[in-house]
């Protein structure tokens, strides 16, 4: 059965508070599966399985699938629809409260697939990356605006701290755009399927990741300000900051959105050296 048929079969009522939008376009489902590149060696962690339409396709291809679902009304539907699969584990929990490192422990070749409510997209991605969860890739359906921020380059309005965070740890690839007509109920915004492939090492080597991300966040907190003014929040004396900018070869009158990840790394290392 397809998504609409399962929803009707169980007379499922959508929970607006959970931001539920279920995918009904089978061509998008096929592109997610193809883009995620799932094989029999992979353990898949799925966040937001809905009524299990995508989950079935994952179960057919993966070694095992762990699906995380918050909505208690979906649990019996998933249990019934997927009862024939012995490689399926259903976790009734808020993904924001999951210990992903514990879940991934002693598992090889972990790939994540998610169709997330838009309000949890950035917190989930940030946690998976900053907590150094051991996964190979994340294939995710997200709001078009967020995907464009993740995939942005310097010197554009979409480029920001989320861009730097994701691209520090991952290569990014947009798989396809998705119309609001591909969902029930129909969302108000366009979506994009994007894949994040985890790098074996961070894109740049820095002396302190904590300082690096502090510099990045401070640089984008007030986008129209120069780096010199933005980085005053670090509470470093004027002479030391002048020295750091000079050693990094970066003009303090530039704005954060003009710096590449490599330049952020160079600047944070020079600040680290003078602390």
Swiss-Prot record:
Keywords: Cytoplasm, Methyltransferase, RNA-binding, rRNA processing, S-adenosyl-L-methionine, Transferase. S-adenosyl-L-methionine binds at residues 21, 23, 48, 69, 94, 115. It catalyses: adenosine(1518)/adenosine(1519) in 16S rRNA + 4 S-adenosyl-L-methionine = N(6)-dimethyladenosine(1518)/N(6)-dimethyladenosine(1519) in 16S rRNA + 4 S-adenosyl-L-homocysteine + 4 H(+). GO terms for molecular function: 16S rRNA (adenine(1518)-N(6)/adenine(1519)-N(6))-dimethyltransferase activity; RNA binding. The keyword Transferase applies. CDD domains: AdoMet_MTases. One of its GO terms (cellular component) is cytosol. This is Ribosomal RNA small subunit methyltransferase A. It comes from Clostridium botulinum (strain ATCC 19397 / Type A). The lineage of its organism: Bacteria, Bacillati, Bacillota, Clostridia, Eubacteriales.
């Amino acid at each position: 059965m397809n998504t609409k048929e399962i929803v009707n079969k169980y007379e499922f009522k959508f929970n607006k508070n959970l931001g539920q939008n279920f995918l009904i376009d089978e061509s998008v489902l096929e592109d997610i599966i193809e883009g995620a590149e799932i094989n029999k060696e992979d353990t898949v962690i799925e966040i937001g399985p809905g009524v299990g339409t995508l989950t079935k396709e994952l179960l057919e291809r993966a070694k095992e699938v762990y699906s995380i679902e918050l909505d208690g009304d979906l649990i019996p539907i998933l249990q019934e629809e997927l009862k024939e699969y012995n490689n399926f584990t259903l976790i009734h929990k808020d993904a924001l409260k999951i210990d992903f490192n514990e879940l991934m422990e002693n598992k090889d070749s972990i790939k994540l697939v998610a169709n997330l409510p838009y309000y949890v997209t950035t917190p989930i991605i940030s946690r998976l990356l900053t907590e150094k969860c051991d996964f190979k890739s994340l294939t995710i359906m997200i709001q078009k605006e967020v995907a464009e921020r993740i995939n942005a380059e310097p010197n554009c309005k979409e480029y920001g701290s989320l861009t730097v965070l994701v691209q520090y740890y991952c290569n990014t690839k947009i798989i396809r755009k998705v119309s609001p007509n591909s969902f029930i109920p129909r969302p108000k915004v366009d979506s994009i399927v994007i894949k994040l492939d985890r790098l074996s090492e961070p894109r740049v080597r820095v002396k302190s990741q904590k300082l690096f991300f502090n510099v990045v966040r401070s640089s984008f907190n007030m986008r129209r300000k120069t780096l010199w003014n933005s980085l005053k929040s670090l509470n470093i004396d004027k002479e030391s900051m002048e020295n750091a900018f000079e050693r990094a070869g970066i003009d303090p009158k530039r704005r954060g959105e003009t710096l590449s990840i490599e330049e952020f790394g160079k600047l944070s290392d020079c600040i680290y050296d003078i602390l």
